[in-house]
């Protein structure tokens, strides 16, 4: 996680937090928007600075000394011609987001470096923590990248995973390369199973589809934009198991947003398609003799139906058990004798003991 202190023209100062993968995507898009200034046509015309490699990126450790720090990178961007330094893409990147108002947790700040861009513009960089140990994975098949921000793979390539996105796209590095890779093309070295996959939650979490999707496989679910579902299993490959009424199946997590959150912002963040599923990969070759442990759709459906039936029984008001306090109180009330109705007083008793008004009413009735 990187922290920036951004000073705007109205002299206001805002602190924003960005992950390296966000900075990487921003840099790639900026180069695509201004190919001449990025040196894509003629390297001598390049004025957009190189993105400095973080210190955990061993393959670029030597190059980092020449590229400078992230602070210098941002300072150079701000000094570029107005069409670049004031373009909406750059300004939007440094605007305060709702997540910036929440302080990062310890897990978020324990990254290899955090840079602070001071308002006086001087280049300072402070190391917050030491080196970070990255997880190592192996490619089970060849993968051809479809965009500049992705990374191509060959079967057997070993990569280090920098960030595991819930979308199923993982940011990885390999020697001097880095980019996004579908998690379905990767397997752990020590086991075919992904130990970080959480357990199913059949109570479900409410989500909304922010993009329509038509099922391709028989175990998938089709949804229209805006439909509400319950997520019962969040898998790291980006294909979550959802429940729509009594139907369960797989759905791309990147097309889902938690209920009650800003849908439009989530829709703008969809920059690529859903990652391929492991079952659709041809010529996949694992180094492990046994396959991954995965629940079948029948198991998901059976467990989900059982949970829903139990929840409906608990919600339905039923008869009280014989030993319950409420039932005992009702039995006690029924067993108590009813009070006797007193006899009607005689006319002589009324004339002797009642008020004059009551006496007159009695006389008129007679």
From Swiss-Prot:
Residue span(s) of domain PX: 1-101
Phosphoserine, modified sites: 279-280, 296, 304, 321, 324
Span list, region Disordered: 261-366
Subcellular location: Cytoplasm
A GO BP entry: respiratory burst
MF term (GO), any: superoxide-generating NADPH oxidase activator activity
UniProt keyword terms in alphabetical order: Cytoplasm, Phosphoprotein, Repeat, SH3 domain
Transmembrane segments: none
UniProt domain SH3: residue ranges: 132-191, 202-261
CDD domains documented for this protein: SH3_p47phox_1, SH3_p47phox_2
Lineage top rank: taxon: Eukaryota
InterPro entries to which the protein is assigned, alphabetical: NADPH_Oxidase/PX-Domain, NCF1_C, NCF1_PBR/AIR, NCF1_SH3_1, NCF1_SH3_2, P47PHOX, PX_dom, PX_dom_sf
Compositional bias of kind Basic residues: 285-294
PROSITE patterns: PX, SH3
A Gene Ontology cellular-component term: cytoplasm
Pfam families, A to Z: NCF1_PBR_AIR, p47_phox_C, PX, SH3_1
Primary role: May be required for activation of the latent NADPH oxidase (necessary for superoxide production).
Name of this protein: Putative neutrophil cytosol factor 1C
Species per Swiss-Prot/TrEMBL record: Homo sapiens (Human)
Gene name of the encoded protein: NCF1C
């Amino acid at each position: 996680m990187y922290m920036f202190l951004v000073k705007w023209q109205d002299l206001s100062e805002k602190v924003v937090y960005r992950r390296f993968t966000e900075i990487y995507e921003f840099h790639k898009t900026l180069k695509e928007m201004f190919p001449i200034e990025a040196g894509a046509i003629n390297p001598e015309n390049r004025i957009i600075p190189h993105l400095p490699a973080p210190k955990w990126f061993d393959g670029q450790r030597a190059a980092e000394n020449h590229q400078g720090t992230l602070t210098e990178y941002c300072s150079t961007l701000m000094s570029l011609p107005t069409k670049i330094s004031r373009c909406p893409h750059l300004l939007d990147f440094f605007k305060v987001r709702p997540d910036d108002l929440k302080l990062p947790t310890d897990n978020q700040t324990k990254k290899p470096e955090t840079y602070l861009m001071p308002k006086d513009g001087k280049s300072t960089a402070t190391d917050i923590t030491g080196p970070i140990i990255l997880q190592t994975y192996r490619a089970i098949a060849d993968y051809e990248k479809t965009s500049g921000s992705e990374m191509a793979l060959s079967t057997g390539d070993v990569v280090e995973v920098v960030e595991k996105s819930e979308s199923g796209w993982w940011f990885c590095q390999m020697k001097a390369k880095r980019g996004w890779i579908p998690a379905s093309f990767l397997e752990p070295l020590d086991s075919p199973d992904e130990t970080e996959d959480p357990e199913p939650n059949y109570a479900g979490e409410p989500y909304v589809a922010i993009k329509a999707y038509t099922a391709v496989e028989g175990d998938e679910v089709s949804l229209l934009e805006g439909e509400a579902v319950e997520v019962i299993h969040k898998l790291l490959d980006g294909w979550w198991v959802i429940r729509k009424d009594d139907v369960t199946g797989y759905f791309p997590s990147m097309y889902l947003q938690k209920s009650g959150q800003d849908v439009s912002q989530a829709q703008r963040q969809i920059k690529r398609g859903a990652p391929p599923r492991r079952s659709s990969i041809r010529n996949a070759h694992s180094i492990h003799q046994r396959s991954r442990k995965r629940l079948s759709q029948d198991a998901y459906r059976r467990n989900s139906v059982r949970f829903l039936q139990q929840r409906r029984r608990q919600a339905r008001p039923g008869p009280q058990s014989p030993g319950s306090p409420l039932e005992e109180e009702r039995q006690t009330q029924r067993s108590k004798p009813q009070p006797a109705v007193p006899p009607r007083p005689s006319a002589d008793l009324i004339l002797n003991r009642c008020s004059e008004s009551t006496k007159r009413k009695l006389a008129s009735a007679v």
